[in-house]
Amino acid sequence: GGPSGGCIPAEHFDIPIDYDNLIAIGSMMGSGGLIVMDETDCMVDIAKFFLEFTVEESCGKCTPCRIGTKRMLEILTRIVNNEGSLEDLDLLETLANTITETSLCGLGQSACKPVQSTLKYFRDEYLAHVVDHHCPICNKEKPHPTIDPEKCKGCGKCRKNCPMEAITG
C-alpha cells in the first residue's frame, strides 16, 4: 500500500493479497505496491518516513490532516530520537484514530495506517525507543559494502546478487 498502507509482520506474509484480507490486518491495497523490509529496518523510523510523505502531500484543506499529521510527525521524531515517552504512544494512537475518522479525503483517512500498524505489530520497537531510550536497530551500524579490488574482475556478474545494490555499471 506504500506510504498510506499498513506495515505487516512476516507472520502475515502468507495471506492472500486482496482488499478484504489486507484491511482485516490493518493495511490496504493502495497503489498495489509492496515494500519488503528486514530486521535491519526500524519500523518506528519507517513509520516516520511514511508520515513525512503524507505531511508533504496533504492539501491542507482539512484540519485533522493538515495539523494532526504534523503533530504525529513531531511525536514520531521525538520517539526516533529516543526522547519520547509512553504517553506519546497513547497520544499517537488517539491522534491516528481522530485523523482517520475525521479527515475529508482518502489521503487523510489512510495517512495513519503505517503508524497504527507499526504500533500494533512492532510495539516492542517503540518500547525500545521510549523505555530503553536506545533502539538496537537504529543504533546498529548498517552494513557498508566494499569491493575487494584483488578479487573483482569488473565483469558485473555479482551485481545482481548484491543485497545493498552497491555494484553499478
Label each residue range with its predicted role.
Residues E150-G154:
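Short Cys/His-rich zinc-binding micro-motifs
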Residues P145-P149:
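Acidic, Ser/Thr/Pro/Gly-enriched interdomain connector segments
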Residues G1-H144:
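Redox cofactor-anchoring modules in respiratory/redox and cofactor-processing assemblies
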Residues P64-K70, K157-G169:
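Iron-sulfur cluster-binding cysteine motifs and their immediate structural context
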